[in-house]
Amino acid sequence: MAATAREDGASGQERGQRGCEHYDRGCLLKAPCCDKLYTCRLCHDNNEDHQLDRFKVKEVQCINCEKIQHAQQTCEECSTLFGEYYCDICHLFDKDKKQYHCENCGICRIGPKEDFFHCLKCNLCLAMNLQGRHKCIENVSRQNCPICLEDIHTSRVVAHVLPCGHLLHRTCYEEMLKEGYRCPLCMHSALDMTRYWRQLDDEVAQTPMPSEYQNMTVDILCNDCNGRSTVQFHILGMKCKICESYNTAQAGGRRISLDQQ
């Protein structure tokens, strides 16, 4: 249920109607940029040609008694609870989802807080099981998702960390896997492909090349380890000699061994 904008005193969201499709809350935000009332900044941004700065919100309106007051967790007039969770920095009101405000991220995150740590180099809160087990890329969270080109850092969609360190929205990652397996930025495998590589080993072994190709070699570059090697050409794939990945690309022309020329 999406909220609609209204000017002060104008008809709009019904009295007592709680929250919107984005948040469960008992108040409307008074946008400091245009003085209109919206349930949340996302509803505002979807309807206006400018963005609401969450940090500049000063006033809210209670959905029950309609009193406009300074931003706080409980209505000073009728004691309506505006949100089980309230951040007086982001002015975020919502039901309790174990949220916490991360000073380094500068915004609120869904917790529990003890399940996450802030990586200073990546500049993002990550799950504890990734601590010391992910590849850091400086300020990677400030880059847009390479699939949808939308913001990742402030997105309400969970970010997925690829083995290469790049980030995608979780939903974009799941869609990407329907079409391919490689990071759209660096071409590194986006998940553990070991089982598939072993299947490909069997297929290559069972598919001999025609005699004129059996002694043909090619230089390859591995997208997974960045190593270079010279291997036998095969139409099904060419396996990196260093890491045994088939995520490779030709780095030079094909050639026939001298003893076969």
From Swiss-Prot:
Give the location in the cell: Nucleus; Nucleus speckle; Cytoplasm
Q: Known Pfam families for this protein?
A: zf-CHY (PF05495), zf-RING_2 (PF13639), zinc_ribbon_6 (PF14599)
Please give the SMART domains that the UniProt record associates with this protein. RING
Zn-finger regions (CHY-type) at which positions?
Answer: 13-80
Q: Which residues bind Zn(2+) 2?
A: 33-34, 44, 50
Write the Enzyme Commission number(s) for this entry.
Answer: 2.3.2.27
Q: Where are the transmembrane segments?
A: none
Where does the protein principally reside? nucleus
GO biological processes = error-free translesion synthesis; positive regulation of proteasomal ubiquitin-dependent protein catabolic process; positive regulation of protein ubiquitination; protein autoubiquitination; protein ubiquitination; rescue of stalled ribosome; ubiquitin-dependent protein catabolic process
Induction remark: Up-regulated during the S phase of the cell cycle. Expressed at low levels during G phase.
- The name under which this protein is listed is RING finger and CHY zinc finger domain-containing protein 1
**Entry's CDD domains?**
RING-H2_Pirh2-like (cd16464)
UniProt pathway annotation: Protein modification; protein ubiquitination
Main function: E3 ubiquitin-protein ligase that mediates ubiquitination of target proteins, including p53/TP53, TP73, HDAC1 and CDKN1B. Mediates ubiquitination and degradation of p53/TP53; preferentially acts on tetrameric p53/TP53. Catalyzes monoubiquitinates the translesion DNA polymerase POLH. Involved in the ribosome-associated quality control (RQC) pathway, which mediates the extraction of incompletely synthesized nascent chains from stalled ribosomes: RCHY1 acts downstream of NEMF and recognizes CAT tails associated with stalled nascent chains, leading to their ubiquitination and degradation.
What is the protein's species of origin? Homo sapiens
Q: Where along the chain is Zn(2+) 4 bound?
A: 87, 90, 101, 108
Catalysis: reaction(s)? S-ubiquitinyl-[E2 ubiquitin-conjugating enzyme]-L-cysteine + [acceptor protein]-L-lysine = [E2 ubiquitin-conjugating enzyme]-L-cysteine + N(6)-ubiquitinyl-[acceptor protein]-L-lysine
